[in-house]
């Protein structure tokens, strides 16, 4: 009740932060005169001066005003652009590890240079993260002259880059790349066979462009490096022939089942579910074609894989539509990013779904894959010591940024006030009426020489709009995943008078639409343009620019609402950049996906009450509120899915960190002889305890079993029973010592046959191999556990607690297996004398061959095809995210282990250090 009054008296938190930063802005401005007086060499020398001051103990915060002044002056000299005061505030926001929300056209790329320059002075590296390779190259090459003028190096990481080139890019002061490439390189580094093969340094500071797209939209898609598994293409083809015979069961409408069938489709949760009739029908068909034995059930343990194939086929046919979720090009299924409309070449859906789509489209079916390494963007980006980001739309997701990443959102004031007019939504009864109204609006704008941008949610809609406009004889350009090669050219001219552009999800395109067109692109298209030609192009552009402004600026038309208000705001933001005039209007119908699934009943009843006729539209605040409520509902559900993904992946992430730490320690070690000796002792102790239980009577001892186990695990035949018969004083402990002594003799003989150096190298490579193979199998087991764990909710058990408990047990078994299998291999193998460098080179070559067979996948997020369950079946509590700026404290050996086992650290995960 007092909140509005307090806000009025003291201002909002955002306003108070802006006021605080304005004081620092004044200090930066005070340095400007001093910087202007410096020569280029003196200004460049400031970088080395700052580095020296940091070495003496000065902090980046203390350097900030002067460093920002240097970056601003360098921007003026090199690029002809001076940072505005509000851009300085944006730079401070990024440096403090926050998210800067800045409107389209406010110069986010230039803002980033301030925080990037300051943090690069530490020498620990800065990663600039973009949503695609084009923007990474464009921004790096655009800002490279500025950074190099200041004495800093710039690198770009791209897919399929030569290793040395990529290593050099990561070693640079500033590195540009995509979120996917950084994430996959992190996974690749943790599959390397040598420290020299790794790419990334310590993850120090990241500035994420379009941060909402990367940390929110893509958080549901785990990153997976996979290798090929067994070929089951024939099975997919057979299943694909059966799926069309299944009929969809239409749920009750006004008390009646309109169409009984075999399965239901839930569009809200994007799930398909076979009913009882469906299970019986599919079992009969599978039996007929010989895929299921007579009398067998699909739910038998050995048939669950077949059931997975059936569900993959159902999802491929009913949830994945051509030209919406994917396109077919060059005989391949290319996934379409639902948020940007771009294709994602090389990315494949996991769990057999991609193969099912290939079978549906009668394409060549590629082999299934097995996970070799995986992570999520949520957990990858939380590895950075400091994280920040910038976008035009973050405030609607401020709660999630804080909950998951502990990142605050700072709304940066615009340099010029917004002049765009946002009209109320127009809602029609049918899609046909809606499209007719859009065409009418387009004609009116073109008659006034206004440029128009039509935003669509799918490729299908963009092509439908294009066909309607062709019928009307209206000239236009189409920008979607099919024609993305022409993207830059289309965007450059989208602001010309009377230009009409249809775009699938403009979000993340990274290019501003300039009123009057882009004169710089026109100049770039000329070969050796003369000063006179450039002057003429500028003059022509100025006339067009003024003409468009007088006509009312860019008009944005949206053909439907997106699930996220943020994507809608991004589309609106294409008009009215930097104080330009402009307008936006959303056209909707009750047949739109969002309206049909979430908002149609309430709006339809309202429209009926008004007695609306065909062709009429409703424009009312109540309708807009109902739509926004529907969007908030979808956003809330998507947040729950992302939160659940994080909660489950946090369990795997702790295990991942332990394994990767173990691996890195192993790679860095010159000699792991002591580690192998510890493994041998532990494996032997466990083996003896299994056959000779502690404090047991000799009558309870299984000596024959122990002899057989020693032969299996250690490749030695020891007469244990004979020793016991010959020596009555031999007890459990002394027997243990005698066996260990014999094992050491056998192992030392192996060392004599080769050499100490060769055996040490071999131990390291064997442990790496065993660790990688078992970790790969563990990931597969964890996947199976996670995908079935939600069923525990029906047994009144908490799925998350069950997952944590069982995954901990699996991890304990993994650690034991690593030790046991390593010792078993080392005991059985015959080591010949081989140059360690040759052995390492051979292993590296094998690793490169493996890498060439790897696939990089986006898995369907857990939760999309499974219900969100906790112990009550309700909403789960939000996982509290760890701090993005952190200083890890080392756990004491006698403290309780972090994993929750209740054991001391030295007796649990401390054993592997």
From Swiss-Prot:
Zinc found in the keyword field: yes
Listed GO biological process terms: intracellular protein transmembrane transport; protein import; protein targeting; protein transport by the Sec complex
Compartment annotation: Cell inner membrane; Cytoplasm
UniProt cofactor note: May bind 1 zinc ion per subunit.
Keywords, alphabetical: ATP-binding, Cell inner membrane, Cell membrane, Cytoplasm, Membrane, Metal-binding, Nucleotide-binding, Protein transport, Translocase, Translocation, Transport, Zinc
Membrane topology: Peripheral membrane protein
Protein EC: 7.4.2.8
GO CC annotations, alphabetized: cell envelope Sec protein transport complex; cytosol; plasma membrane
A single GO molecular function term of this UniProt record: protein-exporting ATPase activity
Enzyme class: translocase
UniProt: Zn(2+) binding residues: 897, 899, 908-909
Cofactor(s) in the UniProt record: Zn(2+)
Residues binding ATP, per UniProt: 87, 105-109, 512
Catalytic activity, reaction form: ATP + H2O + cellular proteinSide 1 = ADP + phosphate + cellular proteinSide 2
Superkingdom field: Bacteria
Family recorded in the similarity comment: Belongs to the SecA family.
HAMAP family found in the cross-reference section: SecA (MF_01382)
Cited function: Part of the Sec protein translocase complex. Interacts with the SecYEG preprotein conducting channel. Has a central role in coupling the hydrolysis of ATP to the transfer of proteins into and across the cell membrane, serving both as a receptor for the preprotein-SecB complex and as an ATP-driven molecular motor driving the stepwise translocation of polypeptide chains across the membrane.
Subunit structure: Monomer and homodimer. Part of the essential Sec protein translocation apparatus which comprises SecA, SecYEG and auxiliary proteins SecDF-YajC and YidC.
Name of the featured protein: Protein translocase subunit SecA
Organism: Pseudomonas savastanoi pv. phaseolicola (strain 1448A / Race 6) (Pseudomonas syringae pv. phaseolicola (strain 1448A / Race 6))
């Amino acid at each position: 009740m007092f909140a509005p009054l307090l806000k009025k008296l003291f201002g909002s938190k955002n306003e108070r932060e802006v006021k605080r930063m304005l004081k620092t802005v004044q200090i930066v401005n005070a340095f400007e005169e001093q910087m202007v007086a410096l020569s280029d060499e003196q200004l460049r020398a400031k970088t080395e001066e700052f580095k020296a001051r940091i070495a003496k103990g000065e902090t980046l915060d203390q350097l900030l005003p002067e460093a920002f002044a240097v970056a601003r002056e360098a921007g003026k000299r090199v690029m002809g652009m001076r940072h505005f005061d509000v851009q300085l505030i944006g730079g401070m926001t990024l440096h403090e590890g926050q998210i800067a929300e800045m409107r389209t056209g406010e110069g986010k790329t230039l803002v980033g240079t301030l925080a990037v320059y300051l943090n690069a002075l530490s020498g620990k590296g800065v990663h600039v993260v973009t949503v695609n390779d084009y923007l990474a190259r464009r921004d790096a090459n655009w800002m490279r002259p500025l950074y190099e003028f200041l004495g800093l190096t710039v690198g770009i990481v791209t897919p399929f880059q030569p290793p040395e080139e990529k290593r050099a890019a990561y070693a640079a002061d500033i590195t540009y790349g995509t979120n996917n490439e950084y994430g996959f390189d992190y996974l690749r580094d943790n599959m390397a066979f040598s420290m020299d093969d790794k790419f990334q340094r310590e993850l120090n500071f990241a500035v994420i462009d379009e941060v909402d797209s990367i940390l929110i939209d893509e958080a549901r898609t785990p990153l997976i490096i996979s290798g090929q598994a067994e070929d089951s293409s024939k099975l997919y083809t057979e299943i694909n022939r059966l799926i069309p015979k299944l009929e969809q069961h239409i749920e009750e409408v006004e008390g009646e089942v309109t169409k009984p069938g075999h399965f239901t489709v839930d569009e809200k949760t994007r799930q398909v579910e076979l009913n009882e009739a469906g299970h019986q029908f599919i079992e009969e068909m599978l039996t007929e074609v010989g895929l299921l034995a007579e009398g067998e059930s699909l739910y038998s343990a050995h048939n669950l894989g077949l059931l997975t194939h059936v569900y993959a086929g159902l999802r491929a046919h009913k949830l994945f539509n051509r030209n919406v979720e994917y396109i077919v090009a060059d005989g391949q299924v290319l996934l379409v990013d639902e948020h940007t409309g771009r294709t994602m070449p090389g990315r494949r859906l996991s769990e057999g779904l991609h193969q099912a789509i290939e079978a549906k489209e009668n394409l060549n079916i590629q082999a299934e894959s097995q996970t070799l390494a995986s992570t999520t963007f949520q957990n990858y980006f939380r590895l950075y010591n400091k994280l920040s980001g910038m976008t035009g739309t973050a405030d609607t997701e401020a709660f999630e940024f804080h909950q998951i990443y502990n990142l605050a959102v700072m709304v940066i004031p615009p340099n010029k006030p917004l002049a765009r007019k946002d009209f109320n939504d127009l809602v029609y009864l049918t899609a046909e009426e809606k499209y007719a109204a859009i065409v009418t609006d387009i004609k009116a704008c073109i008659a006034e020489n206004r440029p128009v941008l039509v935003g669509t949610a799918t490729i299908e809609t963009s092509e439908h709009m294009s066909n309607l406009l062709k019928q009307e004889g209206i000239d236009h350009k189409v920008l979607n995943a099919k024609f993305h090669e022409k993207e830059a050219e289309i965007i450059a001219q989208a602001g010309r008078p009377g230009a009409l552009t249809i775009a699938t999800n403009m979000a993340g395109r990274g290019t501003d639409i300039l009123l009057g067109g882009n004169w710089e692109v026109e100049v770039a298209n000329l070969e050796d343009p003369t000063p006179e030609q450039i002057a003429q192009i500028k003059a022509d552009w100025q006339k067009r620019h003024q003409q468009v402004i007088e006509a009312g600026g860019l008009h944005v038309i949206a053909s439907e609402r997106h699930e996220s208000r943020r994507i809608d705001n991004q589309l609106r933001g294409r008009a009215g950049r930097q104080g330009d005039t402009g307008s936006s209007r959303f056209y909707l119908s009750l047949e739109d996906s969002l309206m049909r699934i979430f908002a149609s009943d309430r709006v339809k009843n309202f429209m009926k009450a008004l007695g609306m006729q065909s062709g009429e539209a409703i424009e009312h605040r109540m309708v807009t509120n109902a739509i926004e409520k529907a969007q908030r509902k979808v956003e809330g559900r998507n947040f729950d899915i992302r939160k659940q993904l994080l909660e489950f992946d946090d369990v795997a992430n702790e295990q991942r960190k332990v394994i990767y730490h173990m691996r890195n320690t192993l790679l860095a070690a010159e000699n792991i002889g002591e580690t192998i000796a510890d493994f041998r002792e532990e494996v032997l102790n466990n083996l003896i305890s299994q056959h000779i239980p502690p404090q047991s009577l000799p009558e309870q001892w299984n000596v024959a079993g122990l002899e057989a186990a020693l032969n299996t695990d250690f490749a030695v035949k020891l007469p244990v029973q004979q020793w016991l018969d010959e020596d009555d004083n031999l007890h459990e402990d002394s027997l243990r010592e005698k066996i260990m002594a014999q094992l050491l003799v056998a192992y030392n003989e192996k060392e004599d046959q080769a050499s100490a150096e060769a055996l040490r190298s071999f131990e390291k490579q064997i442990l790496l191999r065993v660790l990688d193979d078992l970790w790969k199998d563990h990931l597969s087991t964890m996947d199976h556990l996670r995908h079935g764990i939600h069923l525990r909710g029906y047994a009144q058990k908490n799925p998350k607690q069950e997952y944590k408990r069982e995954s901990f047990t699996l991890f304990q078994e993994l650690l034991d297996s690593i030790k046991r299998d390593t010792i078993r291999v080392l005991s059985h193998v015959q080591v010949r004398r081989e140059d360690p460098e040759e052995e390492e080179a051979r292993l590296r070559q094998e690793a490169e061959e493996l890498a060439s067979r790897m696939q990089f996948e986006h898995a369907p997020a857990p939760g999309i095809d499974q219900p969100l369950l906790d112990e009550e079946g309700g909403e789960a509590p939000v996982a509290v995210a760890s701090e993005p700026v952190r200083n890890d404290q080392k756990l004491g050996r006698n403290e309780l282990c972090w994993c929750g086992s209740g054991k001391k650290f030295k007796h649990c995960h401390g054993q592997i250090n």
